[in-house]
């Protein structure tokens, strides 16, 4: 099976935990890492600097569309910052664990 990482930013820890618990609980993801970040970006012609959370979500490639759709339903941002990256290589037992942890 192929595997992917999904990267997403959220407004705060509460939103991150809600997304992580939903994805893992629904077996769409094996794991979600949450960490604090500072983002600088352009929004409506202004430069904005904000404290946010970033998430790295581990899943099977075939589930990425479902993961993205689920995140969109839980996110508060107008323009969701959601991307996926294919895992080219990884520890075989870890990748097997992703398979076993998702449906």
Kindly give the residue locations of the regions a language model identified.
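Positively charged, small/polar-rich N-terminal and surface patches that mediate targeting and assembly
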Residues: 1-103
């Amino acid at each position: 099976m192929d595997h992917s990482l999904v990267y997403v930013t959220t407004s705060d820890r509460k939103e991150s935990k809600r997304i992580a618990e939903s994805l893992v609980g629904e077996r769409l993801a094996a794991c979600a890492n949450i960490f604090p970040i500072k983002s600088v970006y352009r929004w409506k012609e202004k430069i904005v600097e904000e404290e946010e959370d970033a998430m790295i979500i581990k899943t099977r490639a075939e589930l990425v569309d479902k993961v993205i759709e689920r995140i969109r339903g839980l996110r508060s941002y107008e323009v969701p910052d959601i991307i996926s990256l294919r895992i080219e290589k990884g520890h075989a037992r870890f990748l097997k664990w992703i398979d076993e942890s998702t449906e």
